[in-house]
Amino acid sequence: MKRLFAVFAVALLSVSPESSWRNGGESAMNGAAKFGTHDYIALKGYELAGITNLPWITSNLNVYFLGTEAPDVGPKIDGVEDGYHDTGACHCILFNAAGGVTRPRAETRVREEFNKAKQAKANGDNRKAAFYAGAMAHYLGDLSQFCHIMGPQSHWNSEDPKVHTSYEEVVDKTMDFTTHKSSLFDSFIHSVTVTGNTPEQIARGTAAFTEKGDGTERPGLMHAQYKALKEAGKQNDPGQWDAALRNQTGENVNYSANAIAKLLKMI
């Protein structure tokens, strides 16, 4: 019985309790970055910020993309301390029904990575600055995913893990890994006003945008609609999604990309 319990405990520990937007697979150490949803959101943030304003990223764009993987799989460049691969700690900001924050974890991580990027850039180490900026973009990107606004400490309660994983897999399939375009998101990307003047405020505002659903589809509604699509076998084609679900998915990602752009210009 003790042996069985030990095996069961190990199995539980080996399962990640939370998913994230995809990165197109795991890149090799110091290799060319694979491209997925996280890279797309980070790229759009970079573009919205104005490429000519960010030469320190332009000359280290591959490292910037590798940075977007770190919170899920750990750092993929030499010379960077660990402390990533932290999905179990929740890439989330959770709210109660009154709008108060009950769990600010992603807010904290955005600030930490922003500060590291700013310090590295001040030290003349643009390579590390780009990496940390990519990691920062990861946490902001996750806040555009409605399941990252759900959890036992939120008024929505926990999401269905199968819905969480399926939604992210379907979205990632809209990415063209060669052209870096998305058949789902491209039409939604445009400049919008982002609230807040500090990393913490900007991260919280990004989560609040997803939480409030821009006045339409809130996390609980998006979860219920996607779950119904999944049960009907219609989840794999965003063209078959309810227009409100599809549009809110795009608007959430667009706001996140704009939040990244604002912070990149502040580094």
Name each model feature, range by range.
Residues L4-L12:
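Sec-dependent N-terminal signal peptides
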Residues S19-F131, F146-I267:
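N-terminal, motif-rich segments that launch catalysis or mediate targeting to/interaction with membranes
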Residues S14-E18:
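C-terminal segment of classical bacterial N-terminal signal peptides
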Residues A129-G141:
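Short alpha-helix carrying the canonical HExxH Zn2+-binding catalytic motif
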